[in-house]
Every structure is written in structure tokens, then in C-alpha cells.
Amino acid sequence: IHETISFYIGNDPNLKIKWPNDILINDAKISGALIENIIGGENKYTIIGIGINILSSPKLDIYQTAFINEFLNTPINVKHVFLKLKVNLENKLKDFSTKTVNIIRHQMLNNAWKINENVNYISNSIESSGLFENISENYEIIIRTETNQVKLSSGELKLIRD
């Protein structure tokens, strides 16, 4: 998703991945993804929903939003963005090897929102804070607190915006 948006607005250093599933530009949400894993018997499915603000974005009180066309001189077509996203996803998924997983993790680290900064987060309904140090090989966020290092998966954590 980050790669697709970068294709249109360029390699803006303010385009960040808010772990685990949002894309922000200038701290405003431009995209998000929802992932649902369904396991039943021998059947295993993953459903991914992706939203990218292209033509406009909702006005929200809880955080700022952005859309691709506000960064462009010439508006782009929604279908064009969809096709570019489709190609990018297909390219990542067709070679889903250890090498590809490491490349994706490296891209996440290079573009992570608040990496090497103190973050506020909620885990098990408890708000805490710590230094966002890293993302593990299993895509867990690694946070250094005053007393220890914590690894949390996306289902256990919510990063809080300032």
C-alpha cells in the first residue's frame, strides 16, 4: 500500500506506516487495511480490506485525514490506483519467500511512523508508553519500557496518536 501511494506522490519522507495497518502522511491518515483470518477445519482464509483515500477523505474529530489527489497537480483516476495496487500486491504475493518477507520488513522499518520515538500504546486495556525500537521478524512491534522490552502482535496493541 505504501509503495502504491509513493508511486503517485513520490518518495515523501513524511509518508509513514503506522504499525500495523495504517499509512499516514504528515501524521494524517491516507490509507488503512483490515485483516481477518478465518480458520475452520482444513480451510484457512485471510480476507484483506484496503482503503485508500484518493479523491477525498473524511473529516474526523479524532485525527486528521488526507487523500492522494491533494498532493498532485493533475488528479488521478481511482481505477488506475486500484490496478497499480493490484500489481504491487501480486508481485509481493507471487514470491512470498523468506527473502520477500525480509524485504517487506525492511521497508516497514525504513518507513515506520514513530520508530525510535516514545509512543503511547494500549495493550490488554492498559495504556502504557515506551520507545518504539524495532519490528521483529514475526512483525511484532518491539517497545522498550522503563523495566523491560515488550513484543506485541497487532491484536494485542493499539498505538495512540498524540
What are these regions (language model features)?
Residues 22:
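Conserved active-site carboxylates
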